[in-house]
Design a protein with these regions (language model features):
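Short coil turns that delineate tetratricopeptide repeat
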Residues: 31, 65, 99-100, 134-136, ...
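Canonical tetratricopeptide repeat
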Residues: 39, 73, 107-108, 142-144, ...
Length: 254
């Protein structure tokens, strides 16, 4: 626990021994106590103590239900508890309370919706976060919106968002790789090849990126380039799923 948290906990504990200065002071004390309990809930969540995390976040909400941090923390906690309806409700409440002034609330709610809820809604929230002048990394929100749209079976929308991410950070690895997949799946292998090359210039190769490069060159009929990718896959990622797929493919071809 941080020194700041300990200090606030001590201050809240002392309130029981001191007379309150009126309703305004009481509200201020509740807000401070809610902030402490929300922070403690996160600490317990990191320790996988879900029961304690739930107790603390419920207390925080009781003390200050209009706290964006408490509502977001409740979203985290109930998500981990597998209570998706409650988690969604708390994320939505955080977004309503924060408006456009807290892109983090928008982003957190969007991540949840894309993973467990309404992907279209998640995509909309990511775009709202990207449009916020307070969000310093809109390219991340565009990338996430692209991943959400792709998971929802809308590659054209995904491509648009990935390109918007690259317009802000041209060497951002994940959008480059995702665009390579989208172009390969659409049969545009020349564009797919270019995106794979840009990805390998921007980030270390992965089993996934090498396998994609191999698949592109194989489809293009470039046996030499395909074999070079196959060699790298065997050497650099021998235990990967992709290396297993390559082995199965080569065995069937014999």
């Amino acid at each position: 626990m941080s020194r700041r948290t300990l200090a606030v906990v001590a201050a809240v504990a002392l309130l029981g021994a001191a007379p309150l200065a009126g309703a305004q002071q009481t509200q201020a004390d509740r807000e401070k106590a809610a902030a402490v309990n929300a922070e403690l809930a996160i600490t317990y969540l990191k320790q996988d103590n879900l029961r304690a995390a739930r107790e603390k976040v419920d207390k925080a909400l009781e003390q200050n239900p209009r706290s964006v941090e408490a509502q977001m923390t409740a979203g985290f906690v109930y998500d981990r508890l597998g209570e998706d309806k409650k988690a969604a409700s708390h994320y939505d409440q955080a977004v309503k309370l924060a408006g456009k002034d807290n892109p983090d609330a928008l982003n957190n709610a969007a991540v949840f919706q894309c993973r467990k809820g309404d992907k279209k809604r998640g995509e909309e929230l990511f775009l709202q976060a990207a449009a916020s002048p307070l969000y310093r990394t809109p390219e991340i929100a565009y990338m996430n919106a692209g991943n959400c749209a792709r998971a929802d079976g809308r590659p054209k929308d995904a491509e648009r968002y990935f390109r918007q991410a690259l317009a802000r950070r041209p060497n951002m690895p994940d959008p480059l790789l995702q665009l390579a997949f989208i172009q390969h799946e659409a049969g545009n292998n020349m564009q797919a090849r270019a995106f794979v090359q840009r990805y390998h210039d921007a980030a270390p190769a992965t089993a996934q990126s090498i396998w994609l490069g191999y698949s592109i060159e194989r489809d293009q009929g470039d046996a030499v380039a395909a074999e070079e990718y196959a060699r790298r896959l065997r050497m650099e990622f021998p235990t990967s799923v992709e290396a297993g797929q390559l082995f199965d493919q080569e065995r069937k071809a014999q």
